[in-house]
């Protein structure tokens, strides 16, 4: 006789309830969080503007059906597109992530919480334009900053103790979950509707990390977050219609996320949701490089200057040794052919070789015309990594959150340079005072890529005046970015 199926519908999983209660009820009071969110907004938009320089990104942008213009549609920064919020979220999200130059969160799971700005900004602009058309008040940029802080917190707090990469899943699933929650709240959904929306995000089949690792590394890693944040807007809009949710999306035996995708394990949590993640997020300021390599690139730049002072060049190098942390080795320690820019910006040997050869590392250095220089692969072959357990421990320490790398150069004449150690990149919370002026410079450079001088100045006047920016309607701010 077969066992009967228990068809009593459970309460929503506690993990889902905690997310929803946080987005609905938690008041952000941290000045540091808002200060950081302000600069995060500017940096993230700037990253999107730089991506417009690359045809591989631009070809994916615009409406699904060419020529479609949506009434009261979202303005995509740096373009003339006017899109529905779902497709706009994809456009903005793909731009943001394309060059791997936006913010980073490193823990048991890695990720880029500002990826959520795709869904947040698209939803806020769409709501604002429709509100104005109906004679109602638009959303303000302060509401965008609040949504950013909360999306960062959801994605980052889940990532602290839970490794999705170890089960082959891509971190963009956390973008989908975080964006769904904050977008649903922005749309004015009820608590029950937001619970439904978040459960729908967990029930989705989640992206695999296939496209982030050899031998399949490819450009999907540059648009995967855009795909996730746009899916979030879609799910939130579905929930707004009254579409049902799935209370035990995580915990259902056999069919829930834990049993299907997480080896039967439940999530662990280090801290309740607050504003910790935005306060401690990492900015990529100096180099468009996968974050586990940022300090290695900084060390390589220092060594390049030392080589110049000593009258040496990369041709004189016999051996390069990188002392690093475990996550770096697992993600970007790569030998063999590199097939495309996405492959190259996830290879620490490539990202160290370029500054040792040329004294720079820019997004253009991942392109084919640079990579064909035979000296790069020759130097890559001389670069080896090994794990320092102390670096790994500091990486996981919540009070340190170091991303340390140390490089030693040995030369063909038998000499060597003293090891250069960099524990914290310039985008780290411990180096905010050094980093923020450079972050603003990065934003100015990216504005200059797309806009004439007068338009750049109009954007800067508002963007750098925090009080004025916070009060500005979202639609008016995005209008500044239309070409």
From Swiss-Prot:
Q: Which cysteines does the record link by disulfide bonds?
A: none
One GO biological process term = propionate metabolic process, methylcitrate cycle
Give the function comment from the record: Involved in the catabolism of short chain fatty acids (SCFA) via the tricarboxylic acid (TCA)(acetyl degradation route) and via the 2-methylcitrate cycle I (propionate degradation route). Catalyzes the dehydration of 2-methylcitrate (2-MC) to yield the cis isomer of 2-methyl-aconitate. It is also able to catalyze the dehydration of citrate and the hydration of cis-aconitate at a lower rate. Due to its broad substrate specificity, it seems to be responsible for the residual aconitase activity of the acnAB-null mutant.
The UniProt entry, under SUPFAM superfamilies, shows: 2-methylcitrate dehydratase PrpD (SSF103378)
Q: Which phenotype arises from disrupting this gene?
A: Cells lacking this gene abolished the residual aconitase activity of an AcnAB-null strain.
What InterPro entries does its record include? 2Me_IsoCit_deHydtase_PrpD, MmgE/PrpD_sf, MmgE/PrpD_sf_1, MmgE/PrpD_sf_2, MmgE_PrpD, MmgE_PrpD_C, MmgE_PrpD_N
Instruction: Recount the UniProt induction comment for this entry.
Output: By propionate, but not acetate or glucose. Expression of prpBCDE operon is regulated by PrpR, CRP and a variety of sugars such as arabinose, galactose, glucose mannose and xylose.
Q: Which GO terms describe its molecular function?
A: 2 iron, 2 sulfur cluster binding; 2-methylcitrate dehydratase activity; aconitate hydratase activity
Any extra remark in the record? PrpD catalyzes an unusual syn elimination, whereas the addition of water by AcnB to cis-2-methylaconitate occurs in the usual anti manner.
Q: Know the name of this protein?
A: 2-methylcitrate dehydratase
* UniProt pathway: Organic acid metabolism; propanoate degradation; Carbohydrate metabolism; tricarboxylic acid cycle; isocitrate from oxaloacetate: step 2/2
UniProt source species:
Escherichia coli (strain K12)
Superkingdom to which the source organism belongs: Bacteria
Q: Which UniProt keywords apply?
A: Lyase, Tricarboxylic acid cycle
Gene3D superfamilies linked to this entry: 2-methylcitrate dehydratase PrpD
Q: Which family does it belong to?
A: Belongs to the PrpD family.
Give EC number(s), comma-separated.
4.2.1.79, 4.2.1.3
Assembly and partners? Monomer.
User: Which major enzyme category is it?
Assistant: lyase
What reaction(s) does this enzyme catalyze? (2S,3S)-2-methylcitrate = 2-methyl-cis-aconitate + H2O; citrate = D-threo-isocitrate
């Amino acid at each position: 006789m077969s066992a009967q199926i228990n068809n009593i519908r459970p309460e929503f999983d506690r993990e889902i309830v905690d997310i929803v209660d946080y987005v609905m009820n938690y008041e952000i009071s941290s000045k540091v969080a808002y200060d950081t969110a302000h600069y995060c907004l500017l940096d993230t938009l700037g990253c999107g503007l730089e991506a417009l320089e690359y045809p591989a990104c631009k070809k994916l942008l615009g409406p699904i059906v060419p020529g479609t213009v949506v009434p009261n549609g979202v303005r995509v920064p740096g373009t003339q597109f006017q899109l529905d919020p779902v497709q706009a979220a994809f456009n903005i999200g793909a731009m943001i992530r394309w060059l791997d130059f936006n913010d980073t969160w490193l823990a048991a799971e890695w990720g880029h919480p500002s990826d959520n700005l795709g869904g947040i900004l698209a939803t806020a602009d769409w709501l604002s334009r429709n509100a104005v058309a109906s004679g109602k008040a638009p959303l303000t940029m302060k509401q965008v900053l609040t949504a950013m802080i909360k999306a960062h917190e959801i994605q980052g707090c889940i990532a602290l103790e839970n490794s999705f990469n170890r089960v082959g899943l891509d971190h963009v699933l956390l973008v989908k979950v975080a964006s769904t929650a904050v977008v649903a709240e922005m749309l004015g959904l009820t608590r029950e509707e937001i619970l439904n929306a978040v459960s729908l995000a967990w029930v989705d089949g989640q992206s695999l990390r296939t496209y982030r690792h050899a031998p399949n590394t490819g450009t999907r890693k540059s648009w995967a977050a855009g795909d996730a944040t746009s899916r979030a807007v879609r799910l939130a809009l579905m929930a707004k219609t009254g579409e049902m949710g799935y209370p035990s999306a995580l915990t259902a035996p056999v069919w829930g996320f834990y049993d299907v995708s997480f080896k039967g394990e439940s999530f662990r949590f280090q801290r309740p949701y607050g504003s910790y993640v935005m306060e401690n997020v990492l900015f990529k300021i100096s180099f468009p490089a996968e974050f586990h390599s940022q300090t290695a690139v900084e060390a390589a730049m220092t060594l390049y200057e030392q080589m110049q002072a000593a009258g040496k060049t990369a041709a004189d190098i016999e051996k390069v040794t990188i002392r690093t942390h475990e996550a770096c080795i697992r993600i970007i320690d790569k030998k063999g052919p590199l097939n495309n820019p996405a492959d190259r910006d996830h290879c620490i040997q490539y990202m160290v070789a370029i500054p040792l050869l040329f004294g720079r590392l820019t997004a253009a250095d991942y392109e084919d015309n640079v990579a064909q220089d035979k000296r790069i692969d020759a130097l890559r072959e001389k670069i080896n990594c090994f794990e320092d357990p102390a670096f790994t421990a500091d990486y996981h320490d919540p009070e340190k959150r170091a991303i340390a790398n140390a490089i030693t150069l040995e030369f063909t004449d038998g000499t060597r340079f003293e090891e250069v150690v960099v524990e914290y990149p310039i985008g780290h919370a411990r180096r905010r005072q050094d980093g923020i002026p450079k972050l603003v410079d990065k934003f100015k450079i990216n504005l200059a890529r797309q806009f004439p001088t007068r338009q750049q100045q109009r954007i800067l006047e508002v963007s750098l005046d925090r009080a004025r920016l916070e009060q500005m309607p979202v639609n008016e701010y995005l209008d500044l970015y239309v070409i």
